[in-house]
């Protein structure tokens, strides 16, 4: 999702460490104001309860946010056993309370059922839409909508800690996976119920964990700029990652400046040896300046599908 408005034409991606108890959109708007960006969008919402990596795209980078939305994610989650809630997290109402009599062997066996390609029924408390309305709005009105199970992949699900009624897990999943649903399903498999009490996203695509910054750190840079009598953007803008990092996993096709002019006008070009059946990251000239993405068409030409307006 993107928001247009007055502001700077600044392009790039900031890896925000989202705090708990605010919505992803609220966090997005704060970052947009801090950078005074004319356009901003995030790359997949985190629940208000959750913290961690929320890539915020500014300016032309918003055109490529979908690629991050479609990327793999990694989370560390604490599941509290014995209590099931309406939302499958600690912010919901308690549905049931049951004794926890789970052994390590039982937990290992239950976790193993989630590994690999599985089908998952999305939570009613999700942003998936039914007739134009997100499911969570129906859920808050006590209305249950039938949802189809969707294929997901759990690449890894590793136990970090099992103490008392708490299980801490490190989970690496494909796009569209609901961690709260995994935890709820785990609780039912164990026969005691469970809900998410702590959730932190530690990775989106291949972005490094140590590049994340908090809202407080961004605001501190503004104060530092005031004290140093420099523009805050002199301190903020270096934190931005290049917009093409959103599509870094795709093969690069480097073309001449002349061919780049054709592509920027929406025209396909011929590039010998370019791979087909994949998204292509198009760069121009010796500097390998990123201008957008494309695909090979039926005529064997590289056709642009999304271009940056630089």
Curated annotation (Swiss-Prot):
Gene Ontology MF terms in the entry: RNA binding; tRNA pseudouridine(55) synthase activity
Keyword annotations: Isomerase, tRNA processing
InterPro entries with a match to the protein in the record: PsdUridine_synth_cat_dom_sf, PsdUridine_synth_N, PUA-like_sf, PUA_sf, tRNA_psdUridine_synth_TruB, tRNA_sdUridine_synth_fam1_C, TruB_C
Enzyme Commission number(s) of this protein: 5.4.99.25
Enzyme class: isomerase
Catalysed reactions, semicolon-separated: uridine(55) in tRNA = pseudouridine(55) in tRNA
Catalytic site: 47
GO biological process, one term: tRNA pseudouridine synthesis
Pfam families the record matches: TruB-C_2, TruB_C_2, TruB_N
Protein purpose: Responsible for synthesis of pseudouridine from uracil-55 in the psi GC loop of transfer RNAs.
Family listed: Belongs to the pseudouridine synthase TruB family. Type 1 subfamily.
PANTHER family per the UniProt record, alphabetical: PSEUDOURIDYLATE SYNTHASE TRUB1 (PTHR13767:SF2), TRNA-PSEUDOURIDINE SYNTHASE (PTHR13767)
HAMAP family on file: TruB_bact
Annotated protein name in UniProt: tRNA pseudouridine synthase B
Lineage, top ranks: Bacteria, Pseudomonadati, Pseudomonadota, Gammaproteobacteria, Alteromonadales
Gene: truB
């Amino acid at each position: 999702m993107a928001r247009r408005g007055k502001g700077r034409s600044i392009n790039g991606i900031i890896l925000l460490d989202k705090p708990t108890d605010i919505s992803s959109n609220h966090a997005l708007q704060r970052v947009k104001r801090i950078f005074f960006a004319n356009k901003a969008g995030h790359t997949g919402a985190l629940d208000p309860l959750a913290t961690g990596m929320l890539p915020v795209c500014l300016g032309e980078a918003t055109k490529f946010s979908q690629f991050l939305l479609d990327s793999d994610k990694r989370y560390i989650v604490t599941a509290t056993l014995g209590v099931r809630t309406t939302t499958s997290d600690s912010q919901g109402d308690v549905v049931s309370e049951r004794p926890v009599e789970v052994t390590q062997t039982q937990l290992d066996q239950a976790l193993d059922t989630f590994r690999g390609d599985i089908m998952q029924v999305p939570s009613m408390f999700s942003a998936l839409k039914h007739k134009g309305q997100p499911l969570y709005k129906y859920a808050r009105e006590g209305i249950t909508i039938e949802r189809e199970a969707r294929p997901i992949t759990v690449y890894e699900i590793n136990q970090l800690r099992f103490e008392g009624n708490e299980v801490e897990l490190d989970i690496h999943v494909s796009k569209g996976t609901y961690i709260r649903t995994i935890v709820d399903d785990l609780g039912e498999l164990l026969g005691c119920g469970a809900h998410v009490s702590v959730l932190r996203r530690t990775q989106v695509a291949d972005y490094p964990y140590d590049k994340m910054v908090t809202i407080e750190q961004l605001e501190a840079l503004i104060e530092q700029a005031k004290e140093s009598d420099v523009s805050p953007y002199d301190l903020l803008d270096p934190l931005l990652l290049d917009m093409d990092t959103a599509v870094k996993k795709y093969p690069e096709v480097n073309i001449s400046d002349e061919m780049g002019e054709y592509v920027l006008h929406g025209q396909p070009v011929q590039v010998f040896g370019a791979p087909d059946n994949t998204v292509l990251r198009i760069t121009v000239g010796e500097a390998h300046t990123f201008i957008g993405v494309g695909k090979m068409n039926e005529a064997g030409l590289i056709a642009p599908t999304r271009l940056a307006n630089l």
